[in-house]
């Protein structure tokens, strides 16, 4: 197969054949130690999977694959995962800051400052949970749980994408 064939398959909407060609290129480059090129074709192969899901009107899987592309470049970009992690921490911090009485300082009883919101978000995201600042009310507790689960997922994904870069 040639790269021209892939372009023709994509233009014609034959995403399965394009995916097969991308997979062959990926495997060929990987077996020859050209890991950056293999990564490119791995991403292209995954994009064809997503396009096939769109063709088949399987929008649930299409959405998951699109989300996976955005946050990690289909598992090929540790930088994307890191940027998603930073963005998530900042968004959760802003959400907590916008909630009146959302957090409480258990140690000093003082008002929560802007840096405290960021600190709480990092501690919750990384699931350290020192207990000095705690969520108050059901909404703040649910947001904390959501952030902690997001943290576990994204930290695991970061380890996987970094490992793929180091091992290959």
Give names to the regions the model predicted.
Residues 28, 85, 149-152:
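Residue-level hotspots within the lipid-embedded alpha helices of multi-pass solute transporters
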Residues 32, 36, 70-78, 89, ...:
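Short secondary-structure junctions and interdomain/linker hinges
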Residues 38, 95, 162:
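Hydrophobic, well-ordered secondary-structure elements that form the walls
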Residues 1-62:
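N-terminal leader/targeting and pre-domain segments
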Residues 55-99:
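Transmembrane alpha-helical segments and their cytosolic interface motifs
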Residues 108-168:
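Pore domain of cation channels
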Residues 83-119, 139:
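Outer-pore turret/helix-boundary of cation channels
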């Amino acid at each position: 197969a040639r790269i021209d064939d892939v372009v023709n398959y994509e233009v014609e909407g034959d995403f399965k054949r394009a995916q097969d060609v991308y997979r062959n290129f990926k495997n060929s480059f990987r077996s020859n130690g050209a890991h950056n090129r293999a990564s490119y074709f791995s991403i292209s192969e995954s994009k064809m999977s997503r396009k096939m899901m769109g063709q088949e009107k399987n929008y649930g899987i299409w959405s998951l694959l699109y989300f996976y592309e955005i946050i990690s470049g289909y598992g090929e970009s540790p930088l994307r995962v890191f940027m998603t992690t930073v963005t998530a921490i900042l968004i959760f911090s802003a959400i907590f800051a916008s909630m009146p009485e959302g957090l409480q300082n258990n140690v000093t009883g003082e008002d929560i400052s802007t840096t405290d919101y960021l600190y709480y978000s990092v501690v919750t995201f990384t699931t350290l949970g020192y207990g000095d600042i705690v969520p108050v009310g059901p909404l703040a507790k649910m947001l904390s749980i959501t952030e902690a689960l997001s943290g576990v997922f994204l930290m695991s994904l970061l380890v996987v994408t970094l490992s793929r870069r180091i091992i290959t």
